[in-house]
């Protein structure tokens, strides 16, 4: 069994990430608050959930030093970029929207299977505008140049959109691909 830990950054969809992973075969999943000390983290992979603000991310920056694959969703995606030398800014669009995302790296283990494009539910109040060294932009849209990014050497991945919500057409595939990375 692959054990995934969903880190709660107090986003409104965190429970959906937990439920989607819980319902997958071969996966055990737990939900933990972002105040859990890094020494207490024991998992094959982490999902850093979305959330309202970078001011309330607990120990998430420290989790990036753990030797496990990590998937950042929305705020989690932005946090990875910010902590590792990328740049985030306020998005031009803002709010939630149905967005067509173009997959720019069909070989990417997280989003490559969604190529050539997919429809997602995204929030762009803030967004990554420059990826950290070692990362590749793996998806983009008309409203956001970094819809997804990945560093396959460190198994760190992020998506601006919300794969856990029903409005995202192939969201479950993103989580299935992440579990495969963690195995």
Swiss-Prot record:
Record InterPro entries: Class_I_gatase-like, GATASE, GMP_synth_GATase, GMP_synthase_A
Superkingdom: Archaea
Keywords: ATP-binding, Glutamine amidotransferase, GMP biosynthesis, Ligase, Nucleotide-binding, Purine biosynthesis
Gene3D superfamilies: 3.40.50.880
E.C. designation(s): 6.3.5.2
Pfam (any one): GATase
Acetylation as UniProt keyword: no
Keyword flag Ligase: yes
Subunit structure, as described in the record: Heterodimer composed of a glutamine amidotransferase subunit (A) and a GMP-binding subunit (B).
HAMAP family on file: GMP_synthase_A
Protein name (Swiss-Prot/TrEMBL): GMP synthase [glutamine-hydrolyzing] subunit A
Source species of the chain: Halobacterium salinarum (strain ATCC 700922 / JCM 11081 / NRC-1)
